[in-house]
């Protein structure tokens, strides 16, 4: 099937967008060239009515995101142009970053559950990471007794998750006790299922077309690690999770940026197994590039062969993208 829509991408209004050319007008022009019929823009936003936004989200509130309306060109080039949003599910506190009532201002909502690089916000630090930070805090306090407890804590938390994970794995301070890949796999299953049970999410999904962004894709890891983590999740567990989404009428996103192994007709791509199980569970699908650049929109073509391999046809697409 040739994919003729893309409803997951980020313009310069998203803080993570790195391409100054990634404007709504430029996106629409390129998507017409790609042969799309439906195009939706989904910048990262957090509802200011919901407490608990991370520092990264605090400057990306609803009023800010709605400025996109003024950026859309009058000539949509025959495209069905949608104003969407990618909000957040902070699984560590079971907090959905958008109220259902607020979501009605958008044509659709994408909800990720696997931003596993957002530690202690989306995914809790594991016991080893906490133990390492405690060692740092103890040594900083001993070396610099003039610092307050809060200042010591800030210094101990200075290193990001990639450094912390690497130091733990090295065994320089202690022998690791947590299988990190299994931990992440289990946490993603936990976060997906808790999202499906979240009362605000259930209301939101009933109010606005909703799709789970890059499901079970552990963000922030190298591609070989990502593949191993996904492959740790058993078929029956994925089928159960996708059945919960299907029961709520929640779509599943095929995120072309997450398709990291296109060789030999995606023979080693873990998303093939995953999406076949979503199809078996009766889920509908949306496709998105998750592009943060103008050039990234072209990756939608990965979806053509991928949909054929999985068996996704027009009849399996969510209504919003038809």
Regions inferred by a protein language model and the residue ranges of each:
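Hydrophobic residues within beta-strands of alpha/beta enzymes
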Residues: 39-41, 109, 212, 252
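Generic long, charged, amphipathic alpha-helical segments
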Residues: 246, 250-257
């Amino acid at each position: 099937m040739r994919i003729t829509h893309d409803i997951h991408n980020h313009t310069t209004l998203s803080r993570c967008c790195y391409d100054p050319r990634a404007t709504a007008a430029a996106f629409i022009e390129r998507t017409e060239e790609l042969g799309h019929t439906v195009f939706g823009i989904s910048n990262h936003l957090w509802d200011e009515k919901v407490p608990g936004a991370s520092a990264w989200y605090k400057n990306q509130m609803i009023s800010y995101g709605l400025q996109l309306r003024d950026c859309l060109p009058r000539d949509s080039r025959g495209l069905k142009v949608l104003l969407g949003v990618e909000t957040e599910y902070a699984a560590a506190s079971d907090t959905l970053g958008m109220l259902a009532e607020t979501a009605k201002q958008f044509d659709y909502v994408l909800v990720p559950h696997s931003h596993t690089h957002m530690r202690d916000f989306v995914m809790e630090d594991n016991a080893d990471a906490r133990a390492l930070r405690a060692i740092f805090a103890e040594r900083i306090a001993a070396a610099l007794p003039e610092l307050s407890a809060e200042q010591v804590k800030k210094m101990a938390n200075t290193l990001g998750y990639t450094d912390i994970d690497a130091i733990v794995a090295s065994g320089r301070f202690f022998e690791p006790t947590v299988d990190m890949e299994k931990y992440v796999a289990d946490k993603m299953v936990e976060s997906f299922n808790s999202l499906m049970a979240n009362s605000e999410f259930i209301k939101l999904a009933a109010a606005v077309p909703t799709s789970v962004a890059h499901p079970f894709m552990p963000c922030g890891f190298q591609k070989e690690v990502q593949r191993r983590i996904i492959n740790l999740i058993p078929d029956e567990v994925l089928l159960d999770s996708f059945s919960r989404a299907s029961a709520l009428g929640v779509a599943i996103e095929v995120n072309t940026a997450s398709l990291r192994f296109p060789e030999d007709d995606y023979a080693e791509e873990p998303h093939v197994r995953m999406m076949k199980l979503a199809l078996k569970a009766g889920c509908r699908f949306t496709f998105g590039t998750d592009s943060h650049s103008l050039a990234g929109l072209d990756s939608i073509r990965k979806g053509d062969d991928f949909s054929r391999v999985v068996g996704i046809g027009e009849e399996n697409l969510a209504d919003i993208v038809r």
